[in-house]
Amino acid sequence: MNKLVKNYLNIPIIETERLILNYPIETDFKILELFLKSERSKFVGGPYRSFSAWNDYMANIGHWSLYGHGLWSLRIKDNNEYIGRVGIIKPAMFKEPDLAWQVFKDYEGMGYAYEAAIAVKDYTIHNFKFSSLASHIVEGNKNSISLAERVGYKIKKEEIIDKKKFIIYFHM
């Protein structure tokens, strides 16, 4: 079981029935790196090399520091196992804040991404003053498109961002 370290950025902790959405810790990186270096990361800019995976991991921590939001580490409540990330990001090339999720292969199809996305959406509505909240999904990412629709998002537009076609779903 991972030992949790001090939460220097005062990142809120969200609990659901089966999950804990917690701040990133150093030991998360090795597991995240496996995902980011795999073909499964193709919809989030991968596959990455090790240094780029580290930059992605650190950029998330920077998000928390600069904006007060970012990706939570997604953990199973019963055993504290790290199974993915979910949260709000705002890359410079996006016009709206983005509800994003990544669940690792062995945990897909179990409802974890849905449970976490609903929790983050609810937290965001009650704790941030965003005028809109979107999910920017690369065309062809059928699993994420399906999840966005289940979470209650409606397709609003398509846009080319950084030479990729994104389908942008909106909640607010």
Tell where the protein language model's regions lie, with residue ranges:
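Acyl-donor (CoA/ACP) binding surface of acyl/acetyltransferases
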Residues: M1-F43, M58-G62, L71-M172
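Short, surface-exposed alpha-helical recognition segments that flank or form part
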Residues: Y48-R49, Y112
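Active-site rim helix/loop that mediates acceptor-substrate recognition in acyltransferases
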Residues: R49-G68
